């Protein structure tokens, strides 16, 4: 098992699709190696950005098996296994636990059902008690319709098979988690714009969408922070923040995929109900990213911040 100990920049990786709509494994391999070289030191596969609701059970198993072999222990891999059915989550997580190279299971707060805090506590306790993989809680109220309160997270953090959380909430809540977590419980932000602040507060890092397109700058930001170059780190975060926001101006992951396509790293295809960006939307996105309006119709470099002054 590859642990999260030194993993601070993890990408919630997209699932590339071919023109025919199947998973594009050569593109996934190319993108993964690019991200590793750019400074990523962990991945979530089959998460929100991976369009997991549109993947069949067999596709997920095939995807996770392929990805585990590809990474081969170089960095930790977290696979999405959660659902709003506790028994189904247990069964699928135990199936994924048999896949070599998968280190953790990402289990989302159950969407749609809208359980209360007692229900969330019971759900995660039941899953953690019954599965082999250590769990990462995924608290993303904007998508699930309910929020796991900090007190509930801290109760679950004491469970020996719950290893951490991907938290999409306020900085105040993040700070409370960091201050009160038990030893060994990892706290990651799922909000790119919080990437620097959460590290300053003592968190473990970010599970990122923007790292697909801005990994060198995000790695440089964290390296600057570690070296005590706070002005450099802050400057990079200020440069990144509007670009991070732009990557969510249309339903994710369509903006990220549009940029990856222009970089030659993957196609821009999404699965319905997420649509590929139109030509007009690509122009709007390019402008918001600080690029010429026609930039996404051409070829972009793989380093979008090349030449950025950061000293």
From Swiss-Prot:
The active site is at 138 (proton donor/acceptor), 166 (schiff-base intermediate with substrate). GO terms for cellular component: cytosol. Pathway: Amino-acid biosynthesis; L-lysine biosynthesis via DAP pathway; (S)-tetrahydrodipicolinate from L-aspartate: step 3/4. It is found in: Cytoplasm. The keyword RNA-binding does not apply. The record marks 48, 112 as: Part of a proton relay during catalysis. Pfam families: DHDPS (PF00701). Transmembrane segments: none annotated. Keywords: Amino-acid biosynthesis, Cytoplasm, Diaminopimelate biosynthesis, Lyase, Lysine biosynthesis, Schiff base. One of its GO terms (biological process) is lysine biosynthetic process via diaminopimelate. InterPro entries: Aldolase_TIM, DapA, DapA-like, Schiff_base-form_aldolases_AS. It is an enzyme of class 4 (lyase). Its EC number is 4.3.3.7. Belongs to the DapA family. Homotetramer; dimer of dimers. HAMAP family: DapA. This is 4-hydroxy-tetrahydrodipicolinate synthase. It comes from Limosilactobacillus fermentum (strain NBRC 3956 / LMG 18251).
């Amino acid at each position: 098992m590859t642990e999260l100990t030194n993993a601070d920049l993890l990408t919630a990786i997209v699932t590339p699709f071919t023109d025919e709509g199947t998973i594009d494994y050569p593109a996934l391999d190319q993108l993964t190696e690019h991200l590793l070289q750019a400074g990523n030191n962990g991945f979530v596969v089959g998460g929100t950005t991976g369009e997991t609701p549109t993947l069949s059970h067999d596709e997920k198993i095939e995807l996770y098996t392929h990805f585990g072999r590809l990474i081969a222990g170089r960095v930790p891999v977290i696979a999405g296994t959660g659902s709003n059915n506790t028994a189904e989550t247990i069964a699928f997580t135990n199936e994924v636990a048999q896949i070599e190279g998968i280190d953790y299971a990402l289990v989302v707060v159950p969407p749609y059902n809208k359980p209360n805090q007692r229900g969330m506590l019971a759900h995660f306790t039941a899953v953690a008690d019954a599965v082999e993989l250590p769990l990462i809680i995924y608290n993303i109220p904007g998508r699930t319709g309910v929020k796991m309160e900090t007190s509930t997270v801290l109760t679950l953090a004491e469970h020996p098979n719950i290893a951490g959380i991907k938290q999409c909430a306020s900085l105040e809540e993040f700070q409370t988690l960091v201050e009160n977590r038990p030893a060994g419980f990892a706290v990651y932000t799922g909000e790119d714009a919080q990437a620097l602040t959460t590290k300053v507060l003592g968190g473990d890092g970010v599970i990122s969408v923007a790292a697909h397109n801005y990994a060198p700058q995000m790695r440089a930001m964290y390296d600057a922070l570690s070296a005590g170059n706070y002005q450099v780190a802050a400057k990079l975060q200020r440069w990144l923040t509007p670009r991070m926001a732009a990557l969510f101006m249309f339903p994710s992951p369509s903006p990220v995929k549009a940029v990856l396509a222009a970089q030659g790293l993957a196609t821009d295809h999404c699965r319905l109900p997420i649509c590929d960006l139109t030509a007009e939307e690509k122009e709007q996105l390019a402008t918001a990213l600080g690029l010429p309006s026609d930039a996404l119709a051409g070829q972009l470099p793989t380093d979008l911040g090349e030449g950025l002054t950061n000293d």
